[in-house]
């Protein structure tokens, strides 16, 4: 049989598409939208849906102008929709096609603080006002000539409560004193008047500048020293033989040495400069010193003057010759009287008291006086410091992106009133400079010129380049009758003094706004300050009390506003503020949107247009103007970067006891940079600062984390703040 039986077998070969589909059935598709993944999966499995032929109206040709836009047209449409946020398209956008974030989106809402209802408003009697139903100054034991000068020339009709307690004690006894009183209660006159009274009573040998130095008053800041010196000069008008003097950092030591050689009876000084003169000025004779007064003792310790004050007291003790001249100056104390004034009684103040005071008597408005003497080595019952009863404290919780525009709205509202004085506190000098430039764009300076025909001295407005004073400018961004001043420790002493003098000077036709750091928060008696704004939160609750103490002084009314961020900072209200503001109704929470609406609404606030959101368009336009100004001016942009980084460094220096409310790690740095008009990312801003920093070459090799760098520089700032010449 033949092997080949011609049997044919037919095998059907599988279709290539089905083989591919079977291989791809188990292929997992990932990424993209679900709809796209599903379509791809079906295609791999060979289950593509057959497209139905178009019928009906879809076959009718459409005019080109009415044609539905395809995907490319849609992209173009989206680009046009964002035209107002791009610098190259539209008038309100970013430069170089950069995207500008919106002010009113992605803002963190407030967690639990609700705006306070204003239906029930309580008013309280002033807690630091002069006692009108009490005795006059002559009744406190002051001599008649000095009392008449106070009432007739200085218009001080009645003493305050702290003056009623301190003046008789300093006149009748020779005990050391610790005085604790609210800020703005009249502590300066409380210790100055008894010293003048004693010096004026010395009749046997009339005291003049050649008699010697009898009193030294130490202050933590130059501004406070200058103010006390001004008070002494007004008192000398009733007794010209008493000569005051002043030595402070920032002045020429050669001029101070010349004044000390001529002689003075009462010397006001900052600790660093006084210690320098005690070592190097031989003509400064402290052998007859009868009074040593330390004003704002808590701030003296906070600035690190403990060792300096210890050196000063040791020098005074070693050179004292009071016993040798006791018979000559019989009307003066037979021993040196030390006095410490402070608004708080913390451990650092107690430590300073143990260094300076010996068996002191404690005088406080809350507790009158402590019988006998008080030992600072023992535990003293501390009373919580509080704000004046007549002061209204407002709290505004503002998202970080809206901080700058909310400040502008608040200042716009204030500038619409009659002439008022307002103080705005910032955390650092770089922030003061930046915000000063923002609000004084296109502003002018005041310059005194003499009329050639009449010889009359007039004040005229000139361009900023025509005058050397950099401390003030008009603010056309707010109103035509508003002047903004700036004050911080980095300015020259001449600028600081002239700025403060101009701000205090009466001028009823202008609103005056002072941008400053905490250098203006201690002891300064700035008259008629109606509003205090804490744009940056205080570093301690004591700093808060001193800041708001610039308003509501000597029984006058006052308003204060504190800016906080949403989140943990809201806990600062219940954790700290309610203790400092115990009066019901004095602590109020305000809605930032109402402030924006009042500041940027045009016409009637309650009109339909403003309710529909016109005000937020005006607010956005104003903020974008600031951003474009920074993009066009490189110097101003660099200043904004410095202000932002300095603000973060300052924020990191809050005390550990208040770190639960102010944690730098929880800040939204991008949103915060927006409030400085910056469009770069915080990482890029950190790099720009790093390029200008003075690192060693070894450290430049490794890239430093921006957050660690800010914390490191914050520690450096705290360390350098202990020097009075940097304050």
UniProtKB/Swiss-Prot annotation:
It catalyses: ATP + H2O = ADP + phosphate + H(+). This is ATP-dependent RNA helicase DBP7. A motif (Q motif) lies at residues 135-164. It comes from Candida albicans (strain SC5314 / ATCC MYA-2876). A motif (DEAD box) lies at residues 295-298. The gene is DBP7. GO terms for cellular component: nucleolus; nucleus. It comes from the Eukaryota. It is an enzyme of class 3 (hydrolase). Its EC number is 3.6.4.13.
